[in-house]
Regions:
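...captures the hydrophobic TM-helix bundle architecture rather than a specific catalytic motif
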Residues: 1-162
Length: 162
């Protein structure tokens, strides 16, 4: 590429590493958007499981403990992994710099680091699904969450990281 050739969408690097190491606010916003969509569908799947359980009386589909886990994980995913970080992260990275006429955000490396921290916290919180779930409700109120034998500490640590 010569010195006079500007970088545009035709000669921009391609591949997964170009996405993971990008400093472009639009790409980072798209990564926030896609991860938000993923967590939205995961939280929606948990909501469907709860709705199917409540469709008829009795324990038809899942037990009481699994229902409590689904309720907690649905609320935590939708609040802490979708609404709070993904919507402002996606809209704030894609639309806001374009609306104010900025060529880029002020600190692009910090912007990418915030997405990595969000991803790490989300993976840490999702670890609790594999490791047995949490049954305290998405608010994690102290009287019940301190007496619960479920994975409250890893889940709250993942949310704190986010």
């Amino acid at each position: 590429m010569s010195e006079n050739t500007k970088q545009n969408y035709l000669n921009h690097p391609k591949g997964i590493m170009s996405w993971l190491l990008t400093l472009d606010h639009k790409r980072i916003g798209l990564m926030y958007l896609f991860s938000g969509i993923l967590f939205f569908f995961l939280g929606g799947l948990l909501a469907l499981v709860m709705r199917f359980e409540l469709a008829a009386p009795g324990n038809d589909i899942i037990s009481n403990d699994v229902y409590n886990n689904a309720y907690t994980l649905h609320g935590a995913i939708m609040i802490f992994l979708f609404i709070i970080p993904a919507i402002p992260g996606a809209l704030g990275n894609i639309l806001l710099p374009l609306m104010v006429g900025a060529k880029d955000v002020a600190f692009p490396r910090l912007n990418l680091a915030s997405f990595y921290i969000y991803s790490f916290g989300a993976l840490f919180a999702m670890y609790t699904i594999i490791n047995g779930g949490v049954d305290t409700g998405w608010t994690f109120y102290t009287p019940y969450s301190t007496q619960s034998s479920s994975n409250v500490v890893p889940m709250t640590l993942g949310i704190f990281i986010i």
